[in-house]
């Protein structure tokens, strides 16, 4: 069950967003993007800090809300972010500039993730965040697990799909795919995974060392 509206508002209010993130959030809405909730952003920052992330990959740049939170948590990290929409990335680039993030710390790639991900170096990232087309989520997770280093995390935003994943009456392909993934992850020896109900849900998949 998703977090109640009262608790969700409380957690979002706790996650203090500065003017730069607020402006990026407003830009997201204007562009028709559904940004992560402030509480999810705070969780991303905490994970990035705990991981001491140096290299972060993001699938779905949006207007920069997620990227700002991740780089807040890992101020020494470099972010590589993929999106099909150049307009979105231009807004993100402007947001990063307003936050004082050097251009060298935010590499934006305009293109389809399914074309870009296979060309990236395996085991090179501390965090891979997926916040993109739900229909391609399984494909992106498969690539992400190869790209993240041992001990690193693959994060999937909007992992509860507006509560649909928990509703037995919902049987779309996207929902079925996510349910299947969650079930597979729960019994896997290669990863540890958990879903946080904060916001619209955040799935964290930690890559484990191969058994000796």
Q: Which residues are covered by each model-predicted region?
A:
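A short alpha-helical cap/connector motif
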Residues: 1-127, 134-153, 159-212
